[in-house]
Design a protein with these regions (language model features):
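PAPS-dependent sulfotransferase catalytic domain
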Residues: 87-161
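PAPS-dependent sulfotransferase catalytic core
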Residues: 1-88
Length: 161
């Protein structure tokens, strides 16, 4: 069982990682950060599959979790497999981020049930919602993607702004 769990929710380019990194610097003990999870997939199983397949499109993303001491060293894959198979390693703090999800998708019973299967239980749970000024968010996304306004589906809601 985890002592604490932070679920961080925000749109891409809202400063999620800056805030999460700030939190990580404030906490001692066993801390695990799972970045940009998919709501309907076991994030640990996904990471294990990526490492085993060495898919270059996703390897860089999964490789970040190896920076955590819990998954470092030669047995990192064994520890990740334990987590994927619901043999959870106790953590002082578990942080996971969700990016570009509608909030109402996270309150349904199906999500809550899967959450327990994927992460186990935590004594204390905290939701963190990160907001950013919509004009700055749009400008950041456009600059980061170097794309036209109508080419990405997540930018279309801003087209009328």
């Amino acid at each position: 069982m985890n002592d604490r769990e932070f679920r961080v929710v925000g749109l891409r380019r809202t400063g999620n990682h800056a805030i999460i990194n700030w939190i990580l610097q404030q906490v001692d003990g066993t801390v695990v950060f799972v970045n940009d999870i998919f709501i309907n997939e076991n994030p640990f199983r996904t990471v294990v599959e990526v490492f085993e397949s060495q898919d270059p499109d996703f390897y860089w993303r999964a490789n970040r979790i190896k920076s955590n001491p819990l998954y470092a060293g030669e047995d990192y894959l064994d520890n990740l497999r334990k987590e994927a198979n619901r043999d959870f390693i106790p953590k002082d703090l578990l942080i996971f981020s969700l990016e570009d999800y509608r909030l109402k998708l996270m309150d349904v019973k199906r999500y809550q049930k899967r959450h327990l299967l994927y992460f186990g239980n935590s004594k204390e749970k905290t939701d963190i919602l990160i907001l950013r000024d919509p004009y700055n968010l749009l400008a950041s996304r456009l600059k980061n993607e170097r794309i036209g306004l109508k080419t990405r589906s997540y930018l279309k809601p801003f087209a009328d702004v």
